[in-house]
Amino acid sequence: MTATILVEKQKVDRPPLELHYLGDKVLRQPAKRIAKVDDSIRKLAKEMLQTMYSANGIGLAAPQVGINKQLLVVDCEQDKPDEPPLIMINPQITRTSEELCVVEEGCLSVPNVYMDVTRPRAIEVTYKDEHGRPQKRLFAELTARVIQHEMDHLNGVMFVDRVDNPLALAESLKKEGFSMQAVKPVA
């Protein structure tokens, strides 16, 4: 089942939500599960999509717009207007591939910083859709990577925490006005 929230895949003059950036405490708090999927959650998902498209992103988690809820949106097919975005509520990764891949990542909350990150190539995810219906799907390649990246945000983890090259990361962060002190390396 795919999303039925209709949002034009284009920038809006005034994005409805404000992005938060590396160093903001809201990005480090574990997000709370959503108890009930209702119109307020669907409205939030729609506003997150509008904000994501306006920032030229392909994924966005609620903590990135200052909202401590387990909600993320993903759209790796923005050039296909008929392909609906993914809306995931309370997502959980239930399986990962043994095969890992290293790909350069960026983040709307750390603008202009791009670094290599190692992640599983494929994942299985359970989640609720925007109607509260349980879903279980397999994802691979770019979509799997974006989902993992956004799910990290739901746990207070950012992609810079997963970078294996601290010297290059420090240089890149400094160039963009961010501090290495905001990075919390994960094992």
Curated annotation (Swiss-Prot):
- Enzyme class label: hydrolase
InterPro entries reported for this sequence = Peptide_deformylase, Peptide_deformylase_sf
Active-site residues, Swiss-Prot/TrEMBL: E150
What is the UniProt remark on how the cofactor binds and its stoichiometry? Binds 1 Fe(2+) ion.
Cofactor(s) required, per the database record = Fe(2+)
Entry EC number(s): 3.5.1.88
The catalysed reaction is: N-terminal N-formyl-L-methionyl-[peptide] + H2O = N-terminal L-methionyl-[peptide] + formate
Cited Pfam families: Pep_deformylase
Query: What residues does Fe cation bind to?
Result: C107, H149, H153
Supply the alphabetized keyword list.
Hydrolase, Iron, Metal-binding, Protein biosynthesis
Q: Name one GO molecular function term.
A: metal ion binding
GO BP terms, alphabetized: co-translational protein modification; translation
**Family under the similarity heading:** Belongs to the polypeptide deformylase family.
Described by its record, this protein's role is as follows: Removes the formyl group from the N-terminal Met of newly synthesized proteins. Requires at least a dipeptide for an efficient rate of reaction. N-terminal L-methionine is a prerequisite for activity but the enzyme has broad specificity at other positions.
List the protein's name.
Answer: Peptide deformylase
The organism of origin for this protein? Synechocystis sp. (strain ATCC 27184 / PCC 6803 / Kazusa)
